[in-house]
């Protein structure tokens, strides 16, 4: 299995690329994004400039690289920092990542629980979606669940027991995921 789900500090990961949950207005004022801003000020300036130029959109993560070899995937989980995250934007962004990670040269990646915490989404919905979609990638992936997530919600049986639902409510375990990856 190429996906490991755990709790802990994303910044302790040995993955080549770290995923930063952002909004589209150039603010990294809370949560994990604020820590990214502190640790990577050049990345923050690049992100803020892209937001001013209206180049950051939900469902469309982008890769930031610097001369030191830092790989950060800025993953917009919502339009405005005051807004709630939408599961559709998480799904679309994961599919976009799956289509682009090879082109970006990413060999491994560590993801936070996208849209949870300040985004307002629940791990019970986000976790299975992330696990099932990111399992399509051919690289090692770490997913960091929210602190305090019960151990059983980090396991394969929990993450695969219920297929995430498409907007029309249809669900066909593994097959649905393959169709989403291939057609989106």
Predicted regions: what they are:
Residues 1-184:
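Macrodomain-like recognition of ADP-ribose-binding/processing modules
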């Amino acid at each position: 299995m190429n996906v490991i789900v755990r709790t802990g500090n994303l910044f302790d990961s040995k993955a080549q690329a770290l995923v930063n949950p952002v909004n589209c207005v150039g603010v990294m004022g809370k949560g994990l994004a604020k820590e990214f801003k502190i640790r990577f000020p050049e990345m923050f300036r690049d992100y803020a400039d892209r937001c001013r130029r209206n180049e950051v959109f939900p469902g469309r993560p982008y890769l930031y690289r610097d001369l030191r070899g830092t790989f950060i995937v800025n993953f917009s989980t919502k339009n405005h920092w005051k807004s709630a995250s939408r599961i559709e934007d998480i799904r679309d962004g994961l599919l976009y990542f799956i289509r682009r990670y090879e082109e970006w040269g990413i060999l491994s990646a560590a993801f936070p629980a996208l849209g949870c915490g300040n985004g307002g989404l629940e791990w019970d919905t986000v976790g299975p979606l992330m696990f099932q979609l990111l399992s399509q990638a051919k690289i090692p992936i770490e997913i960091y669940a929210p602190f305090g997530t019960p151990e059983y919600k980090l396991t394969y049986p929990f993450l695969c027991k219920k297929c995430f639902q498409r907007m029309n409510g249809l669900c066909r375990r593994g097959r649905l995921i393959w169709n989403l990856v291939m057609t989106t």
